Amino acid sequence: MQTKLSVNINKIATIRNARGGNTPNVELSAIDCERFGAHGITIHPRPDERHITTKDTYDLARVVQTELNIEGYPDQRFMDMVAEIKPAQATLVPDPPHVLTSNAGWDTEKHIVELTKLIAEIKRHGVRTSIFVDTELKNIEFAAKTGVDRIELYTGPYAEHFPINKEEAIAPYVKAAELARELGMEVNAGHDLSLENLAFFKKHIPFLAEVSIGHALISDALYFGLENTVQMYLKELV
């Protein structure tokens, strides 16, 4: 199956915010990513607006023609945005506002009641749901109990161990993904996926629904250009 590429454009907003003004233009970047072949756009509008702002979120909702994936900690601000914008997908991540980047998945057993309520609320708006989790099988099992449509596997540990031992790095992800599929959930993945490790990941999880890639893709675009880079990542997912 064709795994979809959702380009995370947080880093483009980070560059813009470092200088002020509107260069690079976040909306145009999203439109261009789609034009170059991306299947979706991912954003993480944090409360401190360090990269994607609330205004960006609403502006992007008006221009994105593929799938808009809004990820974030499900506080009231986030839930209100999801209810108003109704993106294609909402991905719940457990990081509080002060965390630099998402670095862990949900303890779904501990937060089962809260997550179940949140997932039900989001689904009422016709939005596909996803929960950010690690590969601990218990967290996959309890994610399924929430009624969520998909899980997003946190691939930071995979990327870290890939240069050391590829087979050991991928093994827990294969088990987690297969369990998720058995329990009726589709599987997304994201965090530190790159041109170096993406094809190997897809090869071992061929039913992977979607990857969300930002930091590595935008960094590669500095050298290869955005259009070439999007195409390079798409080829890794064939």
Show where each model-derived region lies:
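Conserved N-terminal beta1-alpha1 strand-loop-helix module at the mouth
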Residues: 1-71, 75-77, 81-87, 142-145, ...
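Hydrophobic faces of well-ordered beta-strands that scaffold small-molecule active sites
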Residues: 3-9, 41-43, 68-70, 90-92, ...
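Glycine-enriched alpha-helix->loop->beta-strand junction motifs that scaffold or abut catalytic
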Residues: 37-39, 63-65, 84-90, 124, ...
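Alpha-helix-loop-beta-strand connector modules within alpha/beta enzyme cores
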Residues: 50-76, 110-130, 166-189, 195, ...
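C-terminal helical cap(s) of enzyme catalytic domains, especially alpha/beta-barrels
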Residues: 61, 104, 165-166, 220-238
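Catalytic cores of alpha/beta
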Residues: 76-85, 136-146, 189, 193-208
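Histidine/lysine/aspartate-rich catalytic loop segments that bind and position anionic ligands
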Residues: 128-180
